[in-house]
């Protein structure tokens, strides 16, 4: 196995654990809501607060990662994530749940700016769409197994058992990833930046502004794709639990279909974008996502729900590698982490606001409201991309 494949496998496994362990939390909200008497607004505070912590942390982590050892930073994040999962076994109510999730979200902030940046550096000159597609697919695969098994295990073993199980998996992933990349070329682990001048705050802000100007058309897409993940994982189990007679295990299977389809789509992404092109892939993704968002707010029949989740899985997950590949092509390797840190911060900032509003509006009008929000905003992004069809995306 060559160095590039070792890096891709290691980063992919870290992504699988990172996204899988984080996906466990919202699936347990129906249990926590009853156990700790939580309101939808409190759930919105928990999810939005967690994203806010990630937003702040990713700016800092992204900025420092470009001159540091990527493998060490990623391993540190996974170990901290494992520790935070153990802390979650000690939940006593809303405040402790909020505190421990904030710690977990800080720990999960390491992967995306560093891991995606590492893949971007490694594959920038050779099949970047393939690299982004595979790392996205492995992250989705981790979340798929989490969604598929979480509610079932929680019913037979208890929710605390889940956190211990994922913590053990995380420690194992770190040991395996460190072993796998132990002998790879140092140049693939650390990118030296010959510019040793320390930036002033004004220079840092100017640099960030210039980076974001180059991808301004993609920014709404990043926000909606991130918000779609949060809304579906956080509020779909609550919607189905309230509006249907389905058991928690069946609800978990329905949600897992969504992400399982996403795994397949990401693996096929390179071929799809060759046929459609990245821009058309994004237009298709956001238009379909919008239609399915409206559909989720209306239909509760199990057959229709399954069809919706398949189409929503295709449309949601195909947008991530397309967006990241666009950004990778215009980003210099010495500022990969910094660039993805800025982008993911904006993505999570928008997602934080939308998740909080979703919780607040759900208390007022009903838990179907988040999917109306998703439908409207996804349609807006699709129309925006169509309107700019004759211009460069970046």
Predicted regions and their residues:
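Juxtamembrane intracellular "pre-TM" segments in multi-pass secondary transporters
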Residues: 1-2, 185-218
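Residue-level signature of mid-helix packing/kink "hotspots" within the transmembrane helices
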Residues: 23, 51-59, 143-144, 259-267, ...
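Extracytoplasmic gate region of multi-pass secondary transporters
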Residues: 25-26, 214-256
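Conserved MFS/SLC helix-loop-helix module at the cytosolic interface between two early adjacent transmembrane helices
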Residues: 56-92
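Helix-to-loop junctions at the C-terminal end of transmembrane segments
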Residues: 57-69, 265-277, 362-363
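Cytoplasmic helix-loop-helix junction between adjacent transmembrane helices
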Residues: 101-139
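Helix-loop-helix hairpin linking two adjacent transmembrane segments in secondary transporters
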Residues: 135-182
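A late C-terminal transmembrane helix in Major Facilitator Superfamily
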Residues: 333-364
């Amino acid at each position: 196995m060559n160095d590039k494949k070792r890096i891709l496998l290691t980063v992919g496994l870290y992504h699988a654990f990172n996204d899988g362990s984080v996906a466990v939390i919202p699936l347990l909200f129906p249990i926590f809501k009853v156990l700790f008497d939580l309101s939808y607004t409190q759930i919105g505070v928990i999810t939005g607060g967690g994203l806010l912590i990630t937003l702040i942390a990713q700016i800092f982590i992204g900025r420092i990662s470009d001159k540091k050892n990527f493998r060490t930073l990623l391993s540190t994040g996974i170990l901290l994530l494992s520790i935070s999962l153990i802390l979650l076994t000690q939940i006593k109510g809303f405040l402790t749940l909020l505190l421990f999730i904030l710690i977990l979200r800080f720990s999960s902030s390491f992967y995306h700016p560093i891991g995606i940046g590492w893949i971007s550096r490694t594959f920038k000159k050779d099949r970047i769409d393939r690299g982004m597609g595979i790392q996205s697919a492995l992250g989705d695969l981790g979340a798929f197994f989490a969604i598929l098994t979480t509610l079932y295990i929680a019913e037979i073993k208890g929710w605390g058992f889940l956190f211990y199980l994922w913590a053990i998996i995380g420690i194992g992933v770190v040991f395996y990833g460190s072993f796998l990349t132990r002998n790879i070329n140092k140049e693939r682990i650390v990118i030296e930046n010959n510019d040793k001048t320390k930036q002033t705050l004004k220079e840092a802000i100017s640099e960030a502004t210039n980076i974001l100007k180059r991808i301004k058309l993609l920014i709404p897409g990043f926000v909606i794709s991130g918000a779609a993940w949060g809304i579906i994982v956080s509020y779909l189990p609550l919607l189905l639990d309230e509006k249907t007679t389905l058991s928690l295990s069946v609800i978990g299977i329905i949600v897992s279909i969504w992400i399982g389809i996403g795994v397949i789509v990401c693996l096929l992404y390179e071929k799809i974008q060759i046929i459609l092109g990245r821009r058309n892939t994004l237009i298709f993704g956001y238009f379909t996502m919008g239609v399915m968002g409206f559909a989720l707010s209306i239909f509760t029949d199990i057959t229709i729900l399954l069809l919706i989740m398949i189409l929503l899985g295709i449309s949601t997950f195909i947008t991530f590698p397309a967006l990241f590949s666009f950004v990778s092509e215009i980003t210099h390797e010495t500022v990969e982490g910094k660039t993805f840190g800025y982008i993911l911060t904006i993505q999570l900032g928008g997602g934080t606001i939308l998740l909080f509003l979703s919780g607040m509006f759900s208390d007022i009008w009903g838990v179907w409201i988040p999917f109306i929000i998703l439908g409207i905003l996804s349609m807006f992004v699709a129309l925006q991309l169509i309107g700019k069809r004759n211009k460069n995306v970046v």
